[in-house]
Curated annotation (Swiss-Prot):
Gene3D superfamilies per record: Vaccinia Virus protein VP39
Positions bound to substrate: K123, D155, T195, E196, Y197, E198
UniProt source species: Lactobacillus helveticus (strain DPC 4571)
InterPro entries named among the record's database cross-references: SAM-dependent_MTases_sf (IPR029063), tRNA_(Gua-N-7)_MeTrfase_Trmb (IPR003358), tRNA_methyltr_TrmB_bact (IPR055361)
Residues that, per the record, bind S-adenosyl-L-methionine: E45, E70, D97, D119
Protein name: tRNA (guanine-N(7)-)-methyltransferase
Length: 217
Protein backbone atom coordinates (compact mmCIF):
# COMPACT_ATOMS: atom_id res chain seq x y z
CA UNK A 1 0.00 0.00 0.00
CA UNK A 2 1.44 3.34 -1.07
CA UNK A 3 1.56 5.97 1.67
CA UNK A 4 0.77 9.62 1.10
CA UNK A 5 3.94 11.67 0.64
CA UNK A 6 5.10 13.41 3.82
CA UNK A 7 7.76 16.11 3.31
CA UNK A 8 8.98 15.78 6.90
CA UNK A 9 9.76 12.09 6.27
CA UNK A 10 11.90 12.88 3.24
CA UNK A 11 13.80 15.51 5.22
CA UNK A 12 14.34 13.16 8.17
CA UNK A 13 15.61 10.36 5.94
CA UNK A 14 18.08 12.69 4.23
CA UNK A 15 19.38 13.87 7.61
CA UNK A 16 20.26 10.35 8.82
CA UNK A 17 22.49 8.51 6.33
CA UNK A 18 23.92 6.53 9.26
CA UNK A 19 20.52 4.85 9.69
CA UNK A 20 19.07 4.88 6.18
CA UNK A 21 20.93 3.60 3.15
CA UNK A 22 19.28 5.04 0.04
CA UNK A 23 19.40 3.47 -3.41
CA UNK A 24 22.76 1.73 -2.96
CA UNK A 25 24.79 0.53 -5.90
CA UNK A 26 23.50 -3.00 -6.69
CA UNK A 27 26.95 -3.86 -8.03
CA UNK A 28 28.44 -3.64 -4.53
CA UNK A 29 27.57 -5.78 -1.52
CA UNK A 30 26.84 -3.74 1.60
CA UNK A 31 29.17 -4.12 4.59
CA UNK A 32 26.51 -4.72 7.20
CA UNK A 33 28.98 -5.37 10.01
CA UNK A 34 30.31 -1.85 9.45
CA UNK A 35 26.79 -0.39 9.35
CA UNK A 36 25.79 -2.05 12.61
CA UNK A 37 29.17 -1.94 14.31
CA UNK A 38 29.01 -5.67 15.04
CA UNK A 39 28.59 -9.04 13.34
CA UNK A 40 25.38 -10.17 15.05
CA UNK A 41 22.92 -12.23 13.03
CA UNK A 42 20.74 -10.35 10.53
CA UNK A 43 17.02 -10.65 9.82
CA UNK A 44 15.27 -8.80 6.96
CA UNK A 45 11.71 -7.61 6.48
CA UNK A 46 10.87 -7.04 2.82
CA UNK A 47 8.36 -4.20 2.53
CA UNK A 48 8.11 -2.87 6.08
CA UNK A 49 5.34 -0.30 5.66
CA UNK A 50 5.10 1.89 8.76
CA UNK A 51 7.44 -0.48 10.54
CA UNK A 52 5.55 -1.66 13.63
CA UNK A 53 6.61 -5.27 13.01
CA UNK A 54 10.33 -4.68 12.43
CA UNK A 55 10.73 -2.03 15.16
CA UNK A 56 9.03 -4.32 17.69
CA UNK A 57 11.34 -7.18 16.71
CA UNK A 58 14.38 -4.93 17.08
CA UNK A 59 13.21 -3.67 20.46
CA UNK A 60 12.53 -7.19 21.75
CA UNK A 61 15.80 -8.68 20.45
CA UNK A 62 18.70 -6.27 21.02
CA UNK A 63 21.21 -9.07 20.36
CA UNK A 64 20.08 -9.38 16.72
CA UNK A 65 20.36 -6.99 13.79
CA UNK A 66 17.38 -6.07 11.61
CA UNK A 67 17.06 -4.52 8.17
CA UNK A 68 13.85 -2.92 6.92
CA UNK A 69 13.96 -3.17 3.12
CA UNK A 70 11.48 -0.53 1.98
CA UNK A 71 11.14 1.30 -1.34
CA UNK A 72 8.93 4.22 -0.24
CA UNK A 73 10.68 7.24 1.28
CA UNK A 74 7.68 8.17 3.43
CA UNK A 75 7.55 4.68 4.92
CA UNK A 76 11.30 4.78 5.54
CA UNK A 77 10.85 8.10 7.35
CA UNK A 78 8.12 6.74 9.60
CA UNK A 79 10.27 3.72 10.49
CA UNK A 80 13.25 5.98 11.10
CA UNK A 81 11.27 8.19 13.46
CA UNK A 82 10.38 5.16 15.59
CA UNK A 83 13.96 3.91 15.47
CA UNK A 84 15.27 7.23 16.75
CA UNK A 85 12.59 7.56 19.43
CA UNK A 86 13.32 4.08 20.78
CA UNK A 87 17.09 4.17 20.26
CA UNK A 88 17.15 1.04 18.12
CA UNK A 89 20.81 0.79 17.18
CA UNK A 90 20.19 -2.73 15.87
CA UNK A 91 17.88 -1.54 13.08
CA UNK A 92 18.98 -0.27 9.68
CA UNK A 93 16.67 0.94 6.91
CA UNK A 94 17.49 0.11 3.31
CA UNK A 95 15.68 2.09 0.62
CA UNK A 96 15.82 -0.23 -2.32
CA UNK A 97 14.01 -2.72 -4.53
CA UNK A 98 13.37 -6.24 -3.25
CA UNK A 99 14.40 -7.53 -6.67
CA UNK A 100 17.97 -6.53 -5.76
CA UNK A 101 18.04 -8.27 -2.38
CA UNK A 102 20.81 -10.63 -3.49
CA UNK A 103 22.87 -7.61 -4.56
CA UNK A 104 22.52 -5.86 -1.21
CA UNK A 105 23.32 -8.88 0.99
CA UNK A 106 26.20 -11.36 0.68
CA UNK A 107 25.49 -15.06 0.34
CA UNK A 108 24.59 -16.89 3.57
CA UNK A 109 24.32 -13.61 5.47
CA UNK A 110 20.81 -13.56 6.96
CA UNK A 111 18.86 -15.92 9.18
CA UNK A 112 15.26 -14.92 8.46
CA UNK A 113 13.41 -13.10 5.68
CA UNK A 114 9.96 -11.79 6.61
CA UNK A 115 7.36 -11.26 3.88
CA UNK A 116 4.40 -9.52 5.50
CA UNK A 117 1.29 -8.61 3.52
CA UNK A 118 3.05 -8.20 0.21
CA UNK A 119 1.22 -6.84 -2.83
CA UNK A 120 -0.68 -9.87 -4.27
CA UNK A 121 -0.35 -8.69 -7.88
CA UNK A 122 -3.49 -10.69 -8.78
CA UNK A 123 -3.28 -10.36 -12.56
CA UNK A 124 -1.54 -13.27 -14.29
CA UNK A 125 0.64 -10.96 -16.35
CA UNK A 126 2.09 -9.57 -13.11
CA UNK A 127 3.02 -12.98 -11.65
CA UNK A 128 6.75 -12.25 -11.83
CA UNK A 129 6.28 -9.28 -9.47
CA UNK A 130 4.96 -11.43 -6.63
CA UNK A 131 7.52 -11.72 -3.85
CA UNK A 132 7.06 -15.49 -3.76
CA UNK A 133 7.65 -15.98 -7.50
CA UNK A 134 10.44 -18.46 -8.24
CA UNK A 135 13.01 -15.81 -9.20
CA UNK A 136 12.56 -14.11 -5.81
CA UNK A 137 12.80 -17.46 -4.02
CA UNK A 138 16.12 -18.11 -5.76
CA UNK A 139 17.45 -14.77 -4.50
CA UNK A 140 16.27 -15.45 -0.95
CA UNK A 141 18.02 -18.80 -1.07
CA UNK A 142 21.29 -17.06 -1.93
CA UNK A 143 21.26 -14.67 1.02
CA UNK A 144 19.85 -17.02 3.67
CA UNK A 145 22.13 -19.12 5.83
CA UNK A 146 21.91 -22.91 5.53
CA UNK A 147 19.51 -23.05 8.48
CA UNK A 148 17.70 -19.82 7.55
CA UNK A 149 14.04 -19.60 6.63
CA UNK A 150 11.21 -17.43 5.28
CA UNK A 151 8.23 -16.29 7.35
CA UNK A 152 5.25 -15.21 5.27
CA UNK A 153 1.90 -13.65 6.25
CA UNK A 154 -0.99 -12.42 4.12
CA UNK A 155 -4.71 -11.76 4.24
CA UNK A 156 -5.04 -12.73 0.57
CA UNK A 157 -6.11 -16.35 0.09
CA UNK A 158 -5.13 -16.31 -3.57
CA UNK A 159 -1.60 -15.13 -2.86
CA UNK A 160 -1.30 -17.66 -0.04
CA UNK A 161 -2.33 -20.57 -2.28
CA UNK A 162 0.01 -19.33 -4.99
CA UNK A 163 2.90 -18.99 -2.53
CA UNK A 164 2.43 -22.49 -1.13
CA UNK A 165 2.48 -23.91 -4.65
CA UNK A 166 5.44 -21.78 -5.74
CA UNK A 167 7.51 -22.77 -2.71
CA UNK A 168 6.55 -26.41 -3.06
CA UNK A 169 7.55 -26.39 -6.73
CA UNK A 170 10.86 -24.82 -5.70
CA UNK A 171 11.50 -27.76 -3.37
CA UNK A 172 11.08 -25.88 -0.12
CA UNK A 173 10.15 -27.50 3.20
CA UNK A 174 7.25 -26.15 5.25
CA UNK A 175 7.83 -25.89 9.00
CA UNK A 176 4.51 -24.21 9.77
CA UNK A 177 1.34 -23.53 7.79
CA UNK A 178 -1.82 -21.83 9.05
CA UNK A 179 -5.02 -20.68 7.35
CA UNK A 180 -6.16 -18.81 10.48
CA UNK A 181 -3.10 -17.61 12.40
CA UNK A 182 -4.99 -15.66 15.05
CA UNK A 183 -6.89 -18.78 16.12
CA UNK A 184 -3.90 -21.08 16.47
CA UNK A 185 -2.67 -22.43 19.81
CA UNK A 186 -2.17 -19.69 22.44
CA UNK A 187 1.62 -20.08 22.44
CA UNK A 188 1.68 -19.41 18.67
CA UNK A 189 -0.67 -16.44 18.86
CA UNK A 190 1.33 -14.90 21.71
CA UNK A 191 4.54 -14.98 19.67
CA UNK A 192 2.95 -13.32 16.65
CA UNK A 193 3.84 -9.67 16.11
CA UNK A 194 1.11 -7.93 14.15
CA UNK A 195 1.70 -5.41 11.40
CA UNK A 196 -0.52 -2.32 11.34
CA UNK A 197 -2.47 -3.73 8.41
CA UNK A 198 -2.80 -7.15 10.02
CA UNK A 199 -4.30 -5.66 13.20
CA UNK A 200 -6.98 -3.75 11.29
CA UNK A 201 -7.83 -6.66 9.01
CA UNK A 202 -7.99 -9.30 11.77
CA UNK A 203 -10.11 -7.01 13.96
CA UNK A 204 -12.85 -7.36 11.34
CA UNK A 205 -12.82 -11.13 11.81
CA UNK A 206 -10.90 -11.95 8.65
CA UNK A 207 -8.38 -14.83 8.67
CA UNK A 208 -4.64 -14.32 8.45
CA UNK A 209 -2.69 -16.90 6.44
CA UNK A 210 0.87 -17.73 7.45
CA UNK A 211 3.72 -20.10 6.75
CA UNK A 212 7.34 -20.72 7.64
CA UNK A 213 9.47 -22.43 5.02
CA UNK A 214 13.12 -23.27 4.44
CA UNK A 215 15.29 -24.50 1.61
CA UNK A 216 16.12 -28.14 2.16
CA UNK A 217 19.79 -29.02 1.78
Amino acid sequence: MRLRNKPWAVKLVNEHPESVLQNPDPEKKIDWAARFGNDNTIEIEVGSGKGHFITTLAENNPDKNYVALELQTTAAGIILRTKLEKGLDNLQILRGDAADINCFFPENSTNVIYLNFSDPWPKTRHEKRRLTYKSFLAKYQQVLTKDGHIEFKTDNSGLFAYSVQSMNNFGMHFDFVSVDLHHEKPEIVEKNIETEYEHKFAAKGNPIYALHADFEA
